[in-house]
Curated annotation (Swiss-Prot):
ZnF locations on chain (B box-type): 89-131
Protein name: E3 ubiquitin-protein ligase TRIM13
Annotated pathway: Protein modification; protein ubiquitination
Record PTM: Auto-ubiquitinated; requires the RING-type zinc finger. Auto-polyubiquitination leads to proteasomal degradation.
Documented EC number(s): 2.3.2.27
Amino acid sequence: MELLEEDLTCPICCSLFDDPRVLPCSHNFCKKCLEGLLEGNVRNSLWRPSPFKCPTCRKETSATGVNSLQVNYSLKGIVEKYNKIKISPKMPVCKEHLGQPLNIFCVTDMQLICGVCATRGSHTKHVFSSIEDAYTQERDAFEFLFQSFETWRRGDALSRLDTLETNKRKSLQLLTKDSDKVKEFFEKLQHTLDQKKNEILSDFETMKLAVMQTYDPEINKLNSILQEQRMAFNIAEAFKDVSEPIIFLQQMQEFREKIKVIKETPLPPSNLPTSPLMKNFDTSQWEDIKLVDVDKLSLPQDTGVLTSRSPWHPCLLLMAVVLLGLLVFFGPTVFLEWSPLEELATWKDCLSSFNSYLTKSADFVEQSVFYWEQMTDGLFVFSERVKNVSLVALNNVAEFVCKYKLL
């Protein structure tokens, strides 16, 4: 098609021929293109018009006007047919048979085929139809298929889309609600942590105040004593060089009294006892605290800042020894009410009888049920007796403690 278009193109305007005219030299040009050349030739020749020369071969032509030139009807018809072919859609070709147009419709396989496919290919003995009939039939089928597809799209896809969007919206709402709960939880947790931190720091401030109240009076006493010592030293410095006996004796008496008062004033202890809380406090013991128990964080309990408690009181140790002695004393008397040997003998007889029945296969099932019930009843009685013995022993111990006021 491209080569044909080159032959149908005017050399002057480089477009398809429009009303082509042929020169005596057999070259073709558009009518409008030749008119333009003739007008230019007339303007350039003022006195006498020069002969017209062919733009292609430069051969002179004695034509006086374009209308006198012959119309090339054959070329004009070819150009018109070419324009129609160029405007019409391009026919597809067969992929199996190169260059063969798909101009037949196979009704059996519902597809376009070429002539080779219909006669010698895989579509032999199939039902065929013309392109026009197939177009009409497939057009009706398209309308039905399109309507059913539209119904399916609206009935299934759109409904699922609505469902997905609804579920998405609900899921986002739930996530937002849960995130708000998480935010509220951590805000409460942070509030609890801040509150607990302030409580513990407040306890430290209270202990600091107690330490100041304990140490400040002793420090003030020592400062007063040091002040008295400085005054005594100043008195000694003032009269050590006095040579008058009366004045020296007076100053000596005052110095001796000052020294006596200083020596009689007791000095406060320098190693005041420290609270166990202040010695043993360590935040590493809080590392095992869980978040749910964060409200239970507290400082170790201490009755006073400057008092310490021994881990074992002598009275508690004595009480433990007494309770152990009571158990040793009252235990045998309690167990006299119940004989374990008799109970074991009864169990031995039951097991011996049960063993004798093991050799009798016929009675084994029936007797095993009976002895199993006997065993469970015996265990229940045994547990009840142990419980009663324990209660009696504890009751005797409690009466002894209350009687002698050990607690």
